[in-house]
Design a protein with these regions (language model features):
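N-terminal amphipathic/basic-hydrophobic helices that include classical n-h-c signal peptides
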Residues: 1-13
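N-terminal glycine-rich anion-binding loop in soluble enzyme alpha/beta folds
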Residues: 16-54
Length: 296
């Protein structure tokens, strides 16, 4: 049997026809389905997937973090369309970023690229040329760029209809809009590390902090040992207790709190089979500070 080898164009050679959507749209109306339909009109053989559509409305930081949590695990050539866009219809830029590991992010440049740029690495940025990369006859539509610009451009890129260079002009990486990220503070005299509550492990109510594993390791932590955990909201103490550090949840009794290293190698705080966030009314963001102190 003679096999025929398919010759790929430059654009097809590194695109894998995989498109992953993220948004704050939810699934209660037709917005997500409309984006899927636009993508399949471009190429019915595209493989469509969904990161989440339950980003808290308008929460750009959360959208940025979920990309950081996910992108690195997808194959090179995967295209992500992320639409958390409270500035839709304004003069904020629409871009496609290429990551160090070869994935592409189609998004408004409004801070959504913050965590990828800081922790994974973005190597190239291009502004979407909407005179070419926009659905026809949508020029007077100002409130659904997720469908008309981002899903359309993402699908064309994933399908190999356009090359990355054909997205639009290259922009300096210094143009990337970034949100504030709290840096970990290590206090040798106090034997403590300080950061903030970045985000929740939403379904289970665990806190995911900004304190990296390496930063936490400056305390020379030991499994089974207790550490003083203090959480502050607007500089007011919201929680303080001695919490045990363990590998995972089942190593403490049901209903007990623990410190652990989560799946993105940050310090997490959880309750075994319970919600820490709900139990102690803890939120997320730079105004929710946390201090972990070694106890002599």
């Amino acid at each position: 049997m003679v096999q025929t080898l398919k010759l790929y164009s430059q654009s097809e050679a590194y695109m894998n026809k995989t498109l992953v959507f993220q948004s704050d749209f939810g699934l209660v109306d037709g917005a997500v389905s409309a984006m899927e339909g636009v993508a399949l009109q471009v190429d019915s053989e595209l493989k469509l997937h969904h990161l989440t559509h339950d980003i808290t409305p308008y929460n750009i930081f959360e959208g940025s973090y979920r990309l950081f949590q996910t992108v690195n695990y997808w194959p090179e050539g995967t295209v992500f369309v992320s639409v958390v866009d409270p500035g839709v219809g304004t003069n904020r830029k629409s871009v496609v970023a290429k990551t160090k590991t070869g994935q592409y992010i189609v998004t408004p440049d409004n801070g959504t690229l913050t965590h990828l740029n800081k922790y994974l690495g973005i190597v190239e940025l291009r502004e979407i040329e909407e005179s070419i990369n926009r659905r026809k006859n949508t020029e007077l539509s100002y409130t659904f760029h997720g469908r008309d610009v981002y899903a359309y451009t993402g699908a064309r890129l994933a399908a190999g209809v356009i090359t990355y260079e054909e997205v639009g002009k290259e922009l300096p990486l210094s143009d990337i809009v970034e949100l504030d990220v709290v840096e970990t503070e290590y206090d040798a005299a106090e034997k403590s590390v300080k950061g903030c509550v970045d985000i929740l492990d939403v379904r289970f109510g665990s806190l995911w902090t900004s304190i990296s594993r390496d930063d936490f390791y400056q305390l020379n932590p030991e499994f089974g040992k207790r550490y003083e955990v203090s959480i502050f909201h607007e500089n007011m103490l919201a929680y303080q207790n001695q919490v045990v550090y363990q590998h995972s949840f089942a190593e403490v009794p049901v209903g007990s709190p623990l410190l652990y290293i989560n799946s993105v190698y940050r310090v997490g705080i959880a309750i075994n089979q319970g919600s820490f966030a709900r139990a102690y009314n803890v939120g997320t963001g730079t105004n929710w500070k946390i201090r972990i102190r070694a106890i002599d």
